[in-house]
């Protein structure tokens, strides 16, 4: 009760929370021969921590798939030429981390360990097997090669050893023993002045989530995970960093713009919001203390919406009732959604207008400032919308980023109108029918029938081989 009163007094003015964190790497660390091997099989710890394990397992109940491209086909155009134009689902329970990265069309249909479109780094937030491999191979060894190389090795879903030092005496005694299991994340926290071993308990809780719930990119020939925080964590800081190193994730196939793809920057947006500024952590809102059948308190590992545990989350600080807070959150979510759609409409036109300019004979020099505006507009839009909980974490920052994106998109279209006029084009550039996901994918030349068929063959033939090999090697219990 005393803790609740203290927290209520401390955070009385707060209204929203929803997610997590990040990092930045320097030299990669070699593997240590002295450390105990990471145990990646989550069920190993079920007898020792039964309540935590069963609640973690309950994330499998969060099974619904929401197709973001079907909901908003504009995204297909904005990501033309990038795997996200094939497939993009909203997030679901941690229990599906490995399943979803295998099944997404973005990872392709590799036949061999050296095949496929994506690097090993795409496993990095999916499994405690990642921590095990980094420990065994070192970071250079882990990151080397294609995504398919990790198939027989990375088989256990995101779980215990991702967040806890499961080999420690503290963990054996029932204490949290939270840790940063990804060395690149630990270095990143140090880079922004937050060394994990010197951080307070509340900061450490959010840092653990921030190993994955952050913006990142794949750096260098080895495609190692790096967080773009060298200049700071605001959208403009990261944009400046990426521009300085001339980095792009891909080139939009319509406009030929060198693009940036934001990932899931929950830590950055949470840090910018009222909850982050008042040290209300990811755990406070998404993993509250609850009671088991015997009345013992434990941390609920069924990570989810704070409103699902209102009495143990929001009500610890807020005096408003659940319905009142839900109404406020819904209004902010709608405001962000409305501006998001307006920005997307401008960007869709900009990509097709840029294509028309190229087709009309525009030069690289003429297009450079236009493409820069498109790049910056879409980056700011993407960083806002890729953080699915931004309406909870930092609604004001979300609207600010989207407003800035709208301005940049308008600048691009104004310059395009002037350039097109010099090429004798004064009429509006028509758009193809992109009213559905399927029509939008057809408009950018995707053969979805072939892509889906190849994926299904991969799931039927390659994935079972991975699992058989993992069982033979003792990496899977069943």
Curated annotation (Swiss-Prot):
Pathway: Nitrogen metabolism; nitrate reduction (assimilation). Heme binds at residues 122, 125-126. GO terms for biological process: anaerobic electron transport chain; nitrate assimilation. Ca(2+) binds at residues 215-216, 261, 263. Heme c 5 binds at residues 275, 314, 317-318. It comes from the Bacteria. Pfam families: Cytochrom_C552. GO terms for molecular function: calcium ion binding; heme binding; iron ion binding; nitrite reductase (cytochrome, ammonia-forming) activity. HAMAP family: Cytochrom_C552. This is Cytochrome c-552. It comes from Salmonella typhi. The lineage of its organism: Bacteria, Pseudomonadati, Pseudomonadota, Gammaproteobacteria, Enterobacterales.
């Amino acid at each position: 009760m005393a803790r609740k009163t203290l927290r209520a007094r401390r955070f009385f003015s707060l209204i929203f929370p929803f997610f997590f964190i990040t990092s930045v790497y320097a030299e990669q660390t070699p593997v240590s021969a002295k450390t105990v091997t990471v145990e990646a099989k989550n069920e190993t710890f079920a007898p020792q921590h039964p309540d935590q394990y069963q609640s973690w397992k309950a994330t499998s109940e969060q099974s619904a798939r929401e197709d973001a491209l079907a909901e908003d086909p504009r995204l297909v155009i904005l990501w033309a030429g990038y795997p996200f134009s094939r497939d993009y689902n909203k997030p679901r329970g941690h229990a599906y981390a490995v399943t979803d990265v295998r099944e997404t069309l973005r990872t392709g249909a590799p036949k061999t360990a050296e095949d496929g479109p994506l690097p090993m780094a795409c496993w990095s937030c999916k499994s405690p097997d990642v921590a095990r491999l980094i420990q065994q191979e070192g970071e250079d060894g882990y990151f080397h090669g294609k995504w398919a190389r990790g198939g027989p090795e990375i088989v256990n879903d995101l779980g215990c050893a991702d967040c806890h030092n499961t080999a420690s005496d503290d963990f054996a005694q029932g204490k949290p023993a939270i840790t940063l299991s990804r060395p690149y994340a630990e270095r990143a926290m140090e880079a922004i002045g937050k060394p994990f071993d010197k951080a307070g308990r509340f900061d450490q809780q959010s840092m653990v989530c921030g190993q994955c719930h952050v913006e990142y990119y794949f750096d260098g020939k080895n495609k190692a995970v790096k967080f773009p925080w060298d200049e700071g964590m605001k959208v403009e800081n990261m944009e400046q960093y990426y521009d300085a190193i001339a980095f792009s994730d891909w080139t939009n196939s319509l406009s030929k713009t060198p693009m940036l793809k934001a990932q899931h920057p929950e830590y950055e947006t949470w840090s910018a919001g009222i909850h982050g500024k008042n040290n209300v952590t990811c755990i406070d809102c998404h993993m509250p203390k609850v009671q088991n059948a015997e009345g013992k308190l434990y941390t609920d590992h069924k990570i989810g919406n704070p409103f699902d545990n209102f009495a143990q989350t929001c009500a610890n600080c807020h005096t408003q009732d659940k319905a009142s807070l839900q109404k406020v959150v819904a209004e902010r979510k709608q405001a962000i959604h409305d501006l998001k759609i307006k920005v997307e409409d401008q960007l869709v036109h900009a990509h097709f207008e840029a294509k028309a300019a190229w087709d009309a004979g525009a030069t690289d020099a003429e297009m450079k400032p236009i493409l820069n505006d498109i790049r910056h507009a879409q980056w700011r839009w993407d960083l806002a919308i890729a953080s699915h909980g931004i309406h909870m974490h930092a609604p004001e920052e979300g609207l600010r980023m989207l407003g800035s994106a709208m301005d940049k998109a308008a600048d691009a279209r104004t310059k395009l109108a002037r350039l097109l006029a010099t090429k004798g084009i004064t009429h509006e550039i028509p758009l193809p029918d992109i009213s559905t996901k399927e029509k939008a994918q057809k408009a950018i030349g995707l053969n979805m029938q072939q892509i889906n068929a190849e994926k299904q063959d991969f799931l039927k033939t390659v994935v079972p081989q991975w699992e058989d090999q993992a069982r033979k090697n003792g990496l899977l219990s069943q």
